[in-house]
């Protein structure tokens, strides 16, 4: 599949394009985010939002969710066939927050999905612009990754909660396409496959008949996506075994969990993209910026530059720390939930703290929360430096994969060591190396044992000044090697519940 010389850049996946050169890619990504911006401006006009209200991230999220819901064909069809009390399948809406007499009030709005689709298409030159929708999904997914923990989901599928760094993109909808698949972590793919296998074990007809044939195709496709994320021959060979299994069952689940654990050290390649809230693109378009003409990239300086001069606000609950709220959104914007805090802090220019120390809850406000006491503050989304986003796991060289901390999946291509607790990880690999995958298992364990925490990843890669848009002078930071930085240590975040 992906390895047969058909690798496309993320931007091509993101824009659904075939092979393009760099300029064409920049233009089509620019067209995509420009369309999001135009749509947002139009929605603000429809809803009569003031400039301040239009810059409120909660309003942006509501508007984004409305357009995603309007284009969710599968769910729309389901809602029409299974009418539930009090849900109009043809309408979509959510909370819009307005400033009235020095207070914030919540207003629930309802719109025809058809109308939302019309506004979206009109903003995107009459096209469906699926790429823009996927982009919004990835932004929501990145926000969830930074906000919630998935301990319960991990435990339910028989995985270890310490594998949280493999769970990027775990809340992405199935319909997020190639761009969505690129940003999913190894753990996310493993979890989707395990759920599928478990259904097959419990439901005899799952793999049978015409439906079963389609299920099987989906299963093999997911296996191939996961295989493409692994960078060592032994891990890939094990994925072939899982994919070719006649009747996937507990043996395959075992193999998948083994592979997920191995990815803590032999890291998979997972793409990272800076996807920003719709209001940010809206602000830029409103100020006369032409994204398509200027070109745009999700993995270079552009998102940093955009955030340098965008002012976005957020509602803040009475006992929340606005600086912490800003950190949460900054991490989401740069897809940095699983990045080493030392690297994030250096790039951001202010200390990024582990989630257990944040005094803030999620960005979205529940419908039963009291608005009387809500305040709003400016989100500080600027950075000191910028760095290129990576799609590799940071293994030091292709075959002999390097050290991986029990909870880092690098976002930025910046030189550092990837400290990890080998004892903690290796403890999970006691015993079981028999069965048909025994030689691969042995090989994988051997590679893991040879990994050294002091090895340097992304050799020679550095961060850049914001004035250095051509990335000519890398500044290679030096980090305190002993002090590893996981965002998830001492975690007390809420669970993600759909």
Curated annotation (Swiss-Prot):
A motif (Bipartite nuclear localization signal) lies at residues 198-216. Residues 1-21 are annotated as: Disordered. SUPFAM superfamilies: flu NP-like. GO terms for molecular function: RNA binding; structural molecule activity. It comes from the Viruses. A motif (Unconventional nuclear localization signal) lies at residues 1-18. Late in virus-infected cells, may be cleaved from a 56-kDa protein to a 53-kDa protein by a cellular caspase. This cleavage might be a marker for the onset of apoptosis in infected cells or have a specific function in virus host interaction. One of its GO terms (cellular component) is host cell nucleus. Its main location: virion. The keyword Ribonucleoprotein applies. InterPro entries: Flu_NP. One of its GO terms (biological process) is symbiont entry into host cell. It is found in: Virion; Host nucleus. Pfam families: Flu_NP. Keywords: Capsid protein, Helical capsid protein, Host nucleus, Host-virus interaction, Ribonucleoprotein, RNA-binding, Viral nucleoprotein, Viral penetration into host nucleus, Virion, Virus entry into host cell. Belongs to the influenza viruses nucleoprotein family. Homomultimerizes to form the nucleocapsid. May bind host exportin-1/XPO1. Binds to viral genomic RNA. Protein-RNA contacts are mediated by a combination of electrostatic interactions between positively charged residues and the phosphate backbone and planar interactions between aromatic side chains and bases. Encapsidates the negative strand viral RNA, protecting it from nucleases. The encapsidated genomic RNA is termed the ribonucleoprotein (RNP) and serves as template for transcription and replication. The RNP needs to be localized in the host nucleus to start an infectious cycle, but is too large to diffuse through the nuclear pore complex. NP comprises at least 2 nuclear localization signals that are responsible for the active RNP import into the nucleus through cellular importin alpha/beta pathway. HAMAP family: INFV_NCAP. This is Nucleoprotein. It comes from Influenza A virus (strain A/Turkey/Wisconsin/1/1966 H9N2). The lineage of its organism: Viruses, Riboviria, Orthornavirae, Negarnaviricota, Polyploviricotina. The gene is NP.
């Amino acid at each position: 599949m992906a390895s047969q010389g058909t690798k496309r850049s993320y931007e091509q996946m993101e824009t659904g394009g075939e092979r393009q050169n760099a300029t064409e890619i920049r233009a089509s990504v620019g067209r995509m985010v420009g369309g999001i911006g135009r749509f947002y401006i139009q929605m603000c006009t429809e809803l009569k939002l003031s400039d301040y209200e239009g810059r409120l991230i909660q309003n942006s999220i509501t508007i984004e969710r409305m357009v995603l819901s309007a284009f969710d064909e599968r769910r729309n069809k389901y809602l029409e066939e299974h009418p539930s009390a009090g849900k109009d399948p043809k309408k979509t809406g959510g909370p819009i927050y307005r400033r009235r007499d020095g207070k914030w009030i919540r207003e629930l709005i309802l719109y025809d999905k058809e109308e939302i689709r019309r506004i979206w298409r009109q903003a995107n030159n009459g096209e469906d612009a699926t790429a823009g929708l996927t982009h919004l999904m990835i932004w929501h997914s990145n926000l969830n990754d930074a906000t919630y923990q998935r301990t319960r989901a991990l435990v339910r599928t028989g995985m270890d909660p310490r594998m949280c760094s493999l769970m990027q993109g775990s809340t992405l909808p199935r319909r997020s396409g190639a761009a969505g698949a690129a940003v999913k972590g190894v753990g996310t793919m493993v979890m989707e496959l395990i759920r599928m296998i478990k259904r097959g074990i419990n439901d005899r007809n799952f793999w049978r008949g015409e439906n079963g044939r389609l299920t099987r195709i989906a299963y093999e496709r997911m296996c191939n996506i996961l295989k493409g994320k692994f960078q060592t021959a032994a891990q890939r060979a094990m994925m072939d075994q899982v994919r070719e299994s006649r009747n996937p069952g507990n043996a395959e689940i075992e193999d998948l969990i083994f592979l997920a654990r191995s990815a803590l050290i032999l890291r998979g390649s997972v793409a990272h993209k800076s996807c920003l809230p719709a209001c940010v693109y809206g602000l830029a378009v409103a100020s006369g910026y032409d994204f398509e003409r200027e070109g745009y990239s999700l993995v270079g300086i552009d998102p940093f530059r955009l955030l340098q001069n965008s002012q976005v606000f957020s509602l803040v609950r009475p006992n929340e720390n606005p600086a912490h709220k800003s950190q949460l959104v900054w991490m989401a914007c740069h897809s940095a939930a699983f990045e080493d805090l030392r690297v994030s802090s250096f790039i951001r220019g202010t200390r990024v703290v582990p989630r257990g120390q944040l005094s803030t809850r999620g960005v979205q406000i529940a419908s039963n929360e009291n608005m009387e006491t809500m305040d709003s503050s400016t989100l500080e989304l600027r950075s000191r430096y910028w760095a290129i986003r990576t799609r590799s796991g940071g293994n030091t060289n292709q075959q002999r994969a390097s050290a991986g901390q029990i909870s880092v999946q690098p976002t930025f291509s910046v030189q550092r060591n990837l400290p990890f607790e080998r004892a903690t990880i290796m403890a999970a690999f006691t015993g079981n190396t028999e069965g048909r995958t025994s030689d691969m298992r042995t090989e994988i364990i051997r590679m893991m044992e040879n990994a050294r925490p002091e090895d340097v990843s992304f050799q020679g890669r550095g961060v850049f000044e914001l004035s250095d848009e051509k990335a000519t002078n890398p500044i290679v930071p030096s980090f305190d090697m002993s002090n590893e930085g996981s965002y998830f240590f001492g975690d007390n975040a809420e669970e993600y519940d759909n």
